[in-house]
C-alpha cells in the first residue's frame, strides 16, 4: 500500500441508520477561525514497536477567492529525519473552500514518496457539476480528467473541516452517512459511522472527552479485506482530531494530536 493512501485514510471517517442518509448535517457557523493550527504525530505500531515516523500540520487562513470570502487550508506531512533514510515522504495539500457551507473551490497536491511523485490541480465547477483535474504522475506525465461532481464530494483538506461543522444534535450512535473524496483521477466512496462518545487517553496529553467515528471504504481498493479506520474528535464543540487509527496487514498507523492553537 502506498503511503499516500495511508495519509489520505488517516484523516477520514463518519455515518447511516438502517436506511442511507444524505450528507452529514451541519451547523451554520463553523467551530474554527482563521489562524488555527493543528499538529499531529504519525506513529507506526506493531507489538512493542511504537515509533513516530512523520509529523503533520494543518493550518487555516481566510482570503478572497474569485471575489468571494473563502477558507484556505494547508495540510503538510513530512517524514521524520531518521525515516528519510528509508523512505522520504513529503505531502503538501492546499484546499480553497467557501465560508458558507464548506464547498470546495480548488485543490492542489504535491507528493513525494520515495521515488514516487504526483501532483493534482483541481478546479471545481459547481454549475456544470464537474471537477476539472490536471494530474501529473511520475511515470505517466500530465493528464487531464473531467471528474463527475455531486454535493458530498470533497478533497482531503476540505473533508477534514467539513466534518468539523457537523450538527451533533441531529446525529445518534449508529447513524451512517455516505461521503466521497477525490484524489488523482478518481473518487472514493466511503461510509462514515458515528459510534458515540467515550473518554480517550491521548498520547502525552492525558484523558479527553471524545467522539468516536469509524470509516468503511465501499469503492476503490485502498485496503485489502473489510478493514475499518477509526478516529476520535474532541467532544467540546471544536471537534479537533485527537487520534486516528488505520490498520495495516502488519501492525497499524496512528495519528495523535500533539498541539492545537485555535
Please give the residue ranges for each predicted region.
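Active-site/ligand-binding surface loops and adjacent short beta/alpha elements
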Residues: 126-183
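Acidic, serine/threonine-rich low-complexity disordered tracts
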Residues: 20-126, 168-262
Amino acid at each position: 500500500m502506498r503511503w499516500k493512501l495511508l495519509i489520505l485514510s488517516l484523516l477520514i471517517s463518519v455515518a447511516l441508520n438502517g436506511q442511507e442518509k444524505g450528507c452529514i448535517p451541519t451547523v451554520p457557523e463553523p467551530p474554527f477561525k482563521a489562524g488555527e493550527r493543528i499538529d499531529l504525530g504519525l506513529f507506526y505500531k506493531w507489538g512493542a514497536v511504537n515509533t513516530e515516523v512523520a509529523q503533520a500540520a494543518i493550518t487555516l487562513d481566510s482570503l478572497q477567492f474569485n471575489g468571494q470570502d473563502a477558507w484556505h487550508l494547508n495540510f503538510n506531512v513530512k517524514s521524520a529525519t531518521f525515516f528519510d533514510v528509508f523512505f522520504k515522504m513529503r505531502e503538501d495539500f492546499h484546499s480553497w473552500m467557501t465560508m458558507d457551507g464548506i464547498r470546495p473551490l480548488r485543490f492542489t497536491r504535491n507528493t513525494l514518496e520515495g521515488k514516487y511523485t504526483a501532483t493534482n490541480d483541481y478546479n471545481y465547477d459547481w454549475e456544470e457539476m464537474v471537477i476539472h483535474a490536471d494530474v501529473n504522475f511520475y511515470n505517466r506525465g500530465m493528464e487531464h480528467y473531467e471528474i463527475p461532481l455531486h454535493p458530498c464530494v470533497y478533497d482531503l483538506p476540505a473533508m477534514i473541516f467539513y466534518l468539523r461543522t457537523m450538527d451533533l444534535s441531529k446525529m445518534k450512535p449508529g447513524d451512517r452517512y455516505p461521503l466521497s473524496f477525490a484524489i488523482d483521477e478518481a473518487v472514493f466512496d466511503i461510509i462514515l459511522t458515528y459510534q458515540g462518545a467515550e473518554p480517550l487517553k491521548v498520547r502525552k496529553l492525558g484523558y479527553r472527552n471524545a467522539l468516536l467515528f469509524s470509516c468503511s471504504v465501499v469503492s476503490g481498493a485502498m485496503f485489502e479485506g473489510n478493514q475499518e479506520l477509526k478516529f476520535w474528535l474532541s467532544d467540546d464543540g471544536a471537534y479537533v482530531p485527537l487520534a486516528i487509527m488505520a490498520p495495516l496487514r502488519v501492525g497499524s498507523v496512528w495519528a495523535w494530536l500533539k498541539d492545537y492553537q485555535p
